[in-house]
């Protein structure tokens, strides 16, 4: 933890620098950042799992306590208004005593509706950052999530501090242990539900603590891109396993995917080819490279796989130009990663929020940035047998280029995705996922 504490000092200094710059530019007194409030289920007395405002958890790892506030201006010591009610029904968060607390002036809030007593006396020139605009209005904030401030913060959030990079390494390290446990469970005959339990046990995190709903897909379920159902019964025949699952560390996410074949067969060879292509694409990452160019290069590699494995005929570029590869690889190559799984800033050209749109032929690409040092991105090429997309090819002449017999043979396996989390450095790439032990 000492190593992390050392980096945290510089992290807070950088966040203060960013705040000082943007509040000066916008003639604001400062920012008031709300952790959030509980959300009550309709007609019930149970709350949905609480998720802290990412702008709040960028400053400190308070992840599970609603009704907290940060008051920052970039000059004075940041103030943390920490919610600690008198409550005999629920567990009350302890007053924090960790390495980061020395960087904050901490005030305790016992009643959420009394926060005005602890906020600046005149907040008309302070900007509110958070989800609950109705609360901000009642409190008297006239500036609520101003576009200029949000765009500035989102643009700079793509450049990670050393503290953030270390948190993300640890999030990867934790997730790798879960992936190894899940792989072992698959080969030992576990169901999707049982694999999920093995994964969560290995990472030591509950379903509401991991950064997103795990995808645990056996056989044809792997063709459903965001499959989060968990079948309790095993399929009649075990063919394949796709797992897309991450872990959290101090609010930072990992996002890792692997695909396995139960037996050595053609599908297993296709996984090997995809793994090779993915590593080649990662080798192409460097500062100055346009991420959309990497995405287009992925389509070239997918096209070659379609030819090599006799899924399609023609030439590779023609398969890309006609949109045939998009039927087999319909999603983007990857995205920014950080406090959020699909982290902000992926389309920002500058700190004013100028938008870089995805290519017209690839609308699902989640990042269009030019790569720069200390950015963290996922690299997740895939190839799937998705009937709804392939059926569109049957409607025109493109269907004549598809070897439907091979498609039928591979359909029961669902699909393939391989995803690593990569830090772009000035002179190299750091593939956290591989370097921390997941082949």
Curated annotation (Swiss-Prot):
Q: Which keywords does the record carry?
A: Dipeptidase, Hydrolase, Manganese, Metal-binding, Metalloprotease, Protease
Q: What is its EC number?
A: 3.4.13.9
Q: Which Pfam family, giving just one, matches this sequence?
A: PepQ_N
GO annotation, cellular component aspect: cytosol
Q: Where does Mn(2+) 1 bind?
A: 255, 335, 380, 419
Task: Give me the comment on cofactor binding.
Answer: Binds 2 manganese ions per subunit.
The answer to whether keyword Protease applies is: yes
Q: State the family it belongs to.
A: Belongs to the peptidase M24B family. Bacterial-type prolidase subfamily.
What is the protein named?
A: Xaa-Pro dipeptidase
Please name the taxonomic classification of the source.
Answer: Bacteria, Pseudomonadati, Pseudomonadota, Gammaproteobacteria, Alteromonadales
């Amino acid at each position: 933890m000492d190593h992390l504490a050392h980096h945290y000092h510089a992290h807070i200094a950088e966040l203060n620098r960013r705040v000082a710059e943007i509040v000066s530019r916008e003639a604001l007194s400062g920012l008031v950042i709300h952790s959030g409030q509980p959300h009550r289920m309709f007609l019930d007395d149970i709350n949905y799992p609480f998720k802290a405002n990412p702008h709040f958890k960028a400053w400190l790892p308070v992840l599970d306590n609603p009704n907290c506030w940060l008051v920052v201006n970039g000059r004075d010591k940041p103030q943390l208004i920490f919610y600690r009610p008198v409550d005999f029904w629920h567990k009350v968060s302890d007053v924090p005593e960790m390495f980061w607390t020395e960087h904050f002036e901490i005030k305790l809030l016992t009643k959420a509706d009394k926060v005005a007593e602890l906020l600046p006396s005149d907040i008309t020139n302070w900007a509110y950052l958070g989800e609950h605009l109705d609360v901000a209005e009642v409190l008297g904030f006239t500036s609520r999530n101003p576009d200029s401030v949000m765009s500035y913060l989102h643009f700079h959030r793509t450049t990670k501090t050393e503290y953030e990079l270390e948190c993300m390494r640890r999030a990867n390290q934790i997730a790798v242990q879960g992936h190894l446990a899940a792989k072992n469970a698959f080969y030992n005959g576990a169901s999707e539900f049982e694999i999920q339990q093995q994964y969560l046990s290995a990472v030591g995190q509950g379903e509401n603590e991991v950064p997103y709903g795990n995808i645990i897909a056996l056989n044809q379920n792997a063709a459903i891109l965001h499959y989060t159902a968990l079948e309790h019964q095993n399929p009649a025949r075990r063919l394949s396993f796709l797992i897309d699952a991450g872990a959290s560390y101090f609010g930072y996410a990992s996002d890792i995917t692997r695909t396995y074949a139960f037996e050595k067969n053609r599908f297993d060879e296709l996984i090997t080819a995809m793994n090779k292509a993915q590593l080649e694409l990662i080798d192409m990452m460097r500062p100055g490279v346009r991420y959309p160019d990497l995405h287009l290069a992925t389509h070239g590699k997918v096209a070659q796989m379609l030819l090599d494995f006799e899924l399609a005929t023609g030439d590779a570029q023609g398969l890309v130009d006609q949109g045939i590869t998009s039927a087999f690889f319909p999603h983007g190559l990857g995205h920014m990663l950080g406090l959020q799984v699909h982290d902000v800033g992926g389309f920002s050209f500058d700190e004013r929020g100028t938008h870089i749109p995805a290519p017209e032929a690839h609308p699902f690409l989640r990042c269009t940035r030019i790569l720069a040092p200390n950015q963290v991105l996922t690299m997740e090429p895939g190839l799937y047998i998705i009937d709804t997309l392939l059926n569109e090819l049957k409607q025109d002449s493109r269907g004549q280029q598809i070897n439907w017999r091979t498609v039928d043979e591979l359909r029961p396996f669902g699909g393939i995705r391989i995803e690593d989390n990569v830090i772009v450095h000035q002179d190299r790439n750091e593939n956290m996922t591989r370097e921390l032990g997941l082949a």
